[in-house]
From Swiss-Prot:
Protein name: D-malate dehydrogenase [decarboxylating]
Entry binding sites for Mn(2+): 224, 248, 252
Single GO MF annotation: D-malate dehydrogenase (decarboxylating) (NAD+) activity
Catalytic class of the enzyme: oxidoreductase
Phenotype upon loss of function: Deletion of dmlA inhibits aerobic growth on D-malate but does not impair slow anaerobic growth on D-malate.
Organism, scientific name: Escherichia coli (strain K12)
Function (record text): Catalyzes the NAD(+)-dependent oxidative decarboxylation of D-malate into pyruvate. Is essential for aerobic growth on D-malate as the sole carbon source. But is not required for anaerobic D-malate utilization, although DmlA is expressed and active in those conditions. Appears to be not able to use L-tartrate as a substrate for dehydrogenation instead of D-malate.
Cofactor: Mg(2+); Mn(2+)
Keywords assigned: Cytoplasm, Magnesium, Manganese, Metal-binding, NAD, Oxidoreductase
Further information: Aerobic growth on D-malate requires, in addition to DmlA, the presence of the aerobic C4-dicarboxylate transporter DctA, for D-malate uptake. Meso-tartrate or L-tartrate are not able to support aerobic growth. Slow anaerobic growth on D-malate is observed only when glycerol is also provided as an electron donor, and D-malate is used in fumarate respiration, so is not dependent on DmlA.
Family annotation (PANTHER family): D-MALATE DEHYDROGENASE [DECARBOXYLATING]
Cellular component, GO annotation: cytoplasm
Length: 361
């Protein structure tokens, strides 16, 4: 008997509450079309509204509750008028990433037909690559502190942490991803000419890992010139792997090069499936447009397609669903309907309706 995939749906804040239901609707249409079963259970916490009533972002047993699910489908978090961003983020998404060991942040970068590219002369097909970001260690640690605070002798120290286990596992994932793609090409982001300890170590581990993948063509590029080449020569990239900080920068720069960050998805993966992985749109909660029913649901729908691909773990039905949703997204982006951010006048549900109809036709 086919397993029903159990998914925790967390709308969060702002437009997350508008786009996530539309994503669920599209995923259920895909399940109907390609013959598998999904069940969704909505969680009302991991939101600033929950914080305003309870003084915390999530209940004490959040880990136990979410561990029962195969995946987490997330909307957006943040309402800075009532809760500072560092509280809402560290109290929800960053907890998920670290305590569920979601050490891979995966961001597809793809130029769709119908989206004007800000880079001169680039066409659909020219930009199609992945950014693989280390998601749990590196430059984003809480180690450090201040001394002589508030005086002219104040000193602030922020430590980076790179472990053999942490570096090797993100590199292994990136090389495996590159091996699965036709071009079999990998670029590693570094800055070993400036960060004299951590980045030479990173480079050493890349070189050591590459020995296990002789068919992969790889290189390393310093982060400054790599950013420039994202803009000037995006067609040269296939899989780009980076530490937490560099990956954070590149994973926003990449989608910006395709014309909009607003339709970009993100996956926070625990590849071993010991814990549930999380799938979300890159955009935030957008308080300025919440309630107007004009939020673009495409990033959430694309994130849902990534979730199906991951949950299927090679199952052809899930791969077909992923590809079918992407084809439907491409058709809607090219021909409409479009929300105002893409120079249209459609509502959030109207875009999802169109994608569902394409999937089910």
């Amino acid at each position: 008997m086919m397993k029903t995939m159990r998914i925790a749906a967390i709308p969060g804040d702002g437009i997350g509450k508008e786009v996530l239901p539309e994503g669920i609707r599209v995923l259920q249409a895909a399940a109907e079309r390609w013959g598998f079963a999904l069940s969704f259970e909505q969680m009302e916490w991991a939101s600033c509204e929950y914080y305003s009533h309870h003084g915390k972002m999530m209940p004490d047993d959040w880990h136990e509750q979410l561990s029962r699910f195969d995946a987490i489908y997330f909307g957006a978090v943040g309402w800075p008028d009532t809760v500072p961003d560092h509280i809402s983020l560290w109290g929800s998404l960053l907890k998920f990433r670290r305590e569920f060991d979601q050490y891979v942040n995966l961001r597809p970068v793809r130029l769709f037909p119908g989206v004007p590219c800000p880079l001169a002369g680039k066409q659909p097909g020219d930009i199609d690559f992945y950014v693989v970001r280390e998601n749990t260690e590196g430059e984003y640690s809480s180690l450090g502190g201040r001394v002589n605070e508030g005086t002219e002798h104040e000193v602030v120290i922020q430590e980076s942490v790179f472990t053999r286990r942490g570096v090797d596992r993100i590199l292994r994932y990136a090389f495996e991803l590159a091996q699965s793609r036709p071009r079999k090409t990998l670029t590693s982001a570094t800055k070993s000419n400036g960060l004299a300890i951590s980045m030479p170590y990173w480079d050493e581990r890349v070189e050591a890992m590459a020995e296990n993948y002789p068919e992969i063509r790889w290189d390393k590029q310093h982060i400054d010139i790599l950013c420039a080449r994202f803009v000037m020569q995006p067609e040269r990239f296939d899989v780009v792997v980076a530490s937490n900080l560099f990956g954070d920068i590149l994973s926003d720069l990449g989608p910006a090069c395709t014309g909009t960050i607003g339709i970009a998805p993100s996956a926070n993966l625990n590849p071993e499936r010991t814990f549930p992985s999380l799938f979300e749109p890159v955009h935030g909660s957008a308080p300025d447009i919440y309630g107007k029913n004009i939020a673009n649901p495409i990033a959430t729908i694309w994130a849902g397609a990534m979730m199906l691909d991951f949950l299927g773990n090679g199952d052809e039905r899930f791969q077909q669903a992923h590809n079918g949703i992407l084809a439907a997204i491409e058709e809607v982006i090219a021909h409409g309907p479009k929300t105002p951010d893409m120079k249209g006048n459609a509502t959030t549900p109207q875009v999802a309706d169109a994608i569902c109809k394409i999937i089910l036709r």
